[in-house]
UniProtKB/Swiss-Prot annotation:
Signal sequence range: 1-20
Name of the protein in its database record: Bindin
Principal location class: membrane
Propeptide: 21-247
Chain ranges passing through the membrane: 431-451
Top-level taxonomy: Eukaryota, Metazoa, Echinodermata, Eleutherozoa, Echinozoa
Coiled-coil blocks: none
Keyword vocabulary terms for this entry: Cell adhesion, Cleavage on pair of basic residues, Cytoplasmic vesicle, Fertilization, Membrane, Signal, Transmembrane, Transmembrane helix
Region described as Disordered: spans on this chain: 161-211, 452-480
Note: A.punctulata bindin forms multilamellar structures reminiscent of lipid bilayers.
Keyword Transmembrane (UniProt): yes
Cited InterPro entries: Bindin (IPR000775)
Annotated region (Fucose-binding domain), positions in chain: 377-385
Amino acid sequence: MDSQVLPLILLIIVFAASSAHGHFPHRTNQDSDCPEASNGCWCHDSFAQCWKTYEVANIARKKDVIRKLELLSLQLEDVLKYIAQLPNLEAIKLGPEGDDHLFECSCDNVLELSGSVVSVVNANDVHVTGCLEHGWSRDIYTMNAFATRCRRRLILESGGAEMRHRRSAKDDDVNKRASPRKGSSPAGKKVQIMEQDAGKGDAHNEKEVVKDQKPTKELFDFFMGHRRKRRSIDDVIGEMRAERQRRYAQGAGGMQGGYGYPQAGGAQYGGQPVQGYMNQGPPMGQRPAAAGPAGGFGAPQGQPPVGQPIGEAAGGGEFLGEPGVGGESEFAEYSSSIGEGETINAEVMEKIKAVLGATKIDLPVDINDPYDLGLLLRHLRHHSNLLANIGDPEVRNQVLTAMQEEEEEEEQDAANGVRDNVLNNLNEGPGAGAVAGAAMAAGMPPYPGGAQGGMRVGGQPQNPMGGNAYNPMTGYRQQG
């Protein structure tokens, strides 16, 4: 029985030895399991350890079975050659063990090594040196840290090259740039547009169309593009000014009676004279004979209906006459927005839009709203630090000029809005004719038609500046 078992045991030992030899590297005490030391490689723990170049080591016959490799005192180029020749290599150790190994500071070799599928098990102990000579801030880096810096530099260099290529192209658009420091003018002034003849569909029938590109025009069209009908700059300017003036007038609506003017609609009842108002005549309900108001816009001469106000001004009464002051003609007379020379011209508005596109401001308002476009200029003025982002001095001066013009127009429109609001209040509500007389006494411009004074009982008209109002002709108050 023992004689049969012994050959079997020997067979197993021989098979195991041959198997261990075939799965190089394998830790063993027998030198025959590893390459000869004289060739520059042998086994060390679970690694095949080499200290000579791949050509000298002569391990080509074992290259398919080597999965772990330790290289001693070799240059990075030789390490890369080992990795390229060993297809099943999984891990590599760079030594000698326990001692920092220094490689030349080369991004190409380090990135190639770190980008391979082979893992460097002691990458934190491997350093590159001589980096100051290559323009780095330090002379020595660990391999992992240097690989990270190389990737970062590569990204920056490729991005810079792409940016230079983009800026040199003919279709460069200033509105697509990431920073205003790159300038406010595109590299190319013209765009070559190839339009193919749709009728024939032949490549030889392509025609070249050259058109000037205006970045500010494109910016304006971009903002207005989602609307069904694009508006011109003049339309936007007109709407902006009209909307702003309307809001100023609304804001002044709560100040009736200010600025030395009497409260609109607050005239006294008939027969009760009050200082600053024209006499309204006898109390309503009595039917005296009344003369027609001077100007011809009132009721016919005779007795007005019971309860009807007497002495209505032009267009001011709810029942008498037709609208007068406050119409389009008066708006044209008293509003400075009608004058062509006092509006923001299209050129200045184009410059403003160019700056908005160049500074890439996060707009806090809807630029499609004409009133908000005015708020945007106010936002620029109140946040003057935004001007520091405009690198072009000429463009910065243009923005400052536009801001100054806008501020002056806001002040003028505010005054016009208050004035128009007072004028409208003079011709609305009860007692408007009396308020008109007080407004005239305060130096307001004359109005067409309207009552020139109160009425006496029996149809006897008072002094043309009658009532208890101030007469600007004499400088004294007249008692009716």
